[in-house]
Amino acid sequence: MSKEVVVESFELDHTIVKAPYVRLIGEETGPKGDIISNFDIRLVQPNEDSIPTAGLHTIEHLLAMLIRKRIDGMIDCSPFGCRTGFHMIMWGQHSSSQIAQVIKSCLEEIAESTSWEDVPGTTIESCGNYKDHSLFSAKEWAKLILSQGISDDAFERHVI
């Protein structure tokens, strides 16, 4: 007896999305009624660009801290293997527009005022690949993404 499994991200037509954007992938309700929201935080255009691992790794560490400073309920924000953005899992219901504002604010802080001392988890004790970071790359990518504007719609540009 085999179970039919559909992985939403493999069903998404990556040729028609318009990055940078935030997209609500879906919401799930747990057995006790708790809602979890899953977001596609796409920072660069799929199959046209990708963020180098060191810069993406640093953005990941910074977002882990900066998002939590701006909004309650973040469970996780993990990079896509294709290095074009992140999955973000949140408790509760949130709009794409609300999350796009949070991501924009985080990227502004990364681009404008973040120093190496601000990057959490960069020691051998706190990171599984602590040598693979680049604040320079993270800042440059944040500036580029911000210059393009972040949309709250994956298919039609609606820059927030």
From Swiss-Prot:
A biological process term (GO) from this entry: quorum sensing
Molecular-function annotations in GO: iron ion binding; S-ribosylhomocysteine lyase activity
Protein name: S-ribosylhomocysteine lyase
Transmembrane feature ranges: none
Residues binding Fe cation, per UniProt: 57, 61, 127
Record keywords, A-Z: Autoinducer synthesis, Iron, Lyase, Metal-binding, Quorum sensing
Assembly, per entry: Homodimer.
PANTHER family given in the database record: S-RIBOSYLHOMOCYSTEINE LYASE (PTHR35799:SF1)
Co-factor remark: Binds 1 Fe cation per subunit.
Listed InterPro entries: LuxS_sf (IPR037005), Metalloenz_LuxS/M16 (IPR011249), S-ribosylhomocysteinase (IPR003815)
Organism: Streptococcus sanguinis (strain SK36)
Cofactor(s) it depends on: Fe cation
Reactions catalysed, as given in the entry: S-(5-deoxy-D-ribos-5-yl)-L-homocysteine = (S)-4,5-dihydroxypentane-2,3-dione + L-homocysteine
Signal peptide residues on this chain, from the entry's feature table: none
Job of this protein: Involved in the synthesis of autoinducer 2 (AI-2) which is secreted by bacteria and is used to communicate both the cell density and the metabolic potential of the environment. The regulation of gene expression in response to changes in cell density is called quorum sensing. Catalyzes the transformation of S-ribosylhomocysteine (RHC) to homocysteine (HC) and 4,5-dihydroxy-2,3-pentadione (DPD).
Family membership: Belongs to the LuxS family.
